[in-house]
Design a protein with these regions (language model features):
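Bacterial N-terminal signal peptides that target proteins for export
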Residues: 1-12
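N-terminal membrane-targeting/anchoring regions of envelope/secretory proteins
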Residues: 10, 15, 29-32
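Residue-level signal for mature regions of secreted extracellular proteins and peptides
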Residues: 16-17, 89
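C-terminal motif of bacterial Sec signal peptides marking the signal peptidase cleavage site
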Residues: 19-22
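C-terminal cap of thioredoxin/glutaredoxin-like
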Residues: 24-43, 48, 91, 107, ...
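N-terminal low-complexity, Pro/Thr/Ser-rich intrinsically disordered segments
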Residues: 36-75
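A short beta-strand-turn-helix
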Residues: 68-86, 114
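Structural alpha/beta surface segment adjacent to cysteine/selenocysteine redox centers
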Residues: 84, 89-180, 246-253
């Protein structure tokens, strides 16, 4: 049972939050929920963390030179922010209602306050939960949008229309409609969606999440800390500010 708020030492546990704010894998085919929390990790703030969408680290497979280029472009397309800034890696599922809740309440403000300000570098990893019927197709389609440097626009559209996907059996037409809405090159997008290379990126994201014992969405690697759940923005800011302070203290030792 979720525990009530309590005081937490910043270097051991950034935040305690008493409501259910994350999608879990579920035991009987239905979504479970977990309590938002933050735990210390063991990564340097500005060096590549263990969860990172960079081709050299992910191991995504490329059978041809064209596939290799596709993977690199897709990987780069889901990064946002200065290269020397502290990493914040989001692990998410486009059909998870708590991921949408976090996105709708926090993403624009996070971009304004931290990404555009040069304080953090944002990356997105996919964890399409099996309880969400269309999450994998959405993840793969978003990486095809990333190839055209419109990952974040497509992610915005997927979260905006999340409810529409609940009532359709085949998501293909809806995925293409969203691609047209953001002016993607449609022949390229359609061809990309059949690419084994794109599938390998999403599959490898899942392997990375599993190896890091991430089982719920949204989860975030914030500098040295793993944060789980759709924290309110002010609490998420405190998590980032604490991680930034830890990184600064390490640099000045």
């Amino acid at each position: 049972m979720p525990q009530p708020r309590s005081a937490c030492r910043a270097t051991a546990l950034l935040l305690c939050f008493s409501v259910l704010t994350a999608c879990g894998r579920g035991d009987a085919g239905s979504a479970s929920a977990v309590t938002a929390k933050a735990e210390p990790g063991a990564v340097s703030a500005t060096t590549p963390p263990p969860l990172l969408p960079v081709t050299a680290l992910t191991g995504a497979t490329a059978d041809t030179l064209a596939d290799s280029v596709l993977i690199q472009r897709a990987d780069r397309g889901r990064l946002m922010g200065r290269e020397d800034a502290m990493w914040v890696v989001m692990i998410s599922d486009f059909q998870c209602p708590y991921c949408k809740q976090w996105h709708d309440s926090s993403m624009a403000r996070l971009k304004r306050d931290y990404i555009d300000a040069g304080k953090i570098r944002m990356a997105y990893l996919h964890l399409p939960l099996s309880i969400h019927q269309h999450a994998r197709a959405q993840a793969e389609a978003s990486m095809c949008a990333a190839v055209q440097d419109k990952f974040w626009d497509y992610a915005e559209a997927l979260f905006r229309d999340q409810r529409a996907f609940q009532s359709i059996e085949n998501p293909g037409a809806k995925l293409e409609q969203l691609a047209r809405d953001i002016s993607l090159d449609m022949p390229s997008f359609t061809k990309c969606r059949t690419s084994d290379a794109i599938r390998s990126i999403v599959a490898n994201d899942e392997r990375q999440a599993s190896q890091a014992r991430v089982q719920s969405t949204p989860s975030f690697l914030v500098g040295d800390f793993m944060v789980q759940g759709a924290l309110p923005y002010q609490d998420f800011r405190r998590a980032i500010d604490t991680a930034l302070a830890v990184a600064k203290a390490r640099r000045t030792r």
